[in-house]
Amino acid sequence: MNILFVLSSVPHTSPWSTQVAMVMITCNLLAIVAGRYAIKVRGLGPSIPVSGVEGFGLPELLATTSLGHVIGAASILGLSNVGLIS
């Protein structure tokens, strides 16, 4: 495949800024909150050293933040293409 064709089809993305960081943080927090209540089998792996999150360990944290990053990247690309993030 011609690399120039691939490069020409990549959309313009906004550079890293405070707006981009806030969108990513918000998406990750929403995914963690949703995962806290949606994950049925919890606490099978090692726990994280944070008080008040009994039963929400490292595997759950990695899973929810992975989902949060996927949602955040899609949100940033979408908001960038619409023009709401510069």
Swiss-Prot record:
It is a single-pass membrane protein. Disulfide bonds: none annotated. GO terms for biological process: photosynthesis. The keyword DNA damage does not apply. The chain crosses the membrane at residues 15-34. It holds the Pfam family PSI_PSAK. It is found in: Plastid, Chloroplast thylakoid membrane. One of its GO terms (cellular component) is photosystem I. Keywords: Chloroplast, Membrane, Photosynthesis, Photosystem I, Plastid, Thylakoid, Transmembrane, Transmembrane helix. SUPFAM superfamilies: Photosystem I reaction center subunit X, PsaK. Belongs to the PsaG/PsaK family. This is Photosystem I reaction center subunit PsaK. It comes from Pyropia yezoensis (Susabi-nori). The gene is psaK.
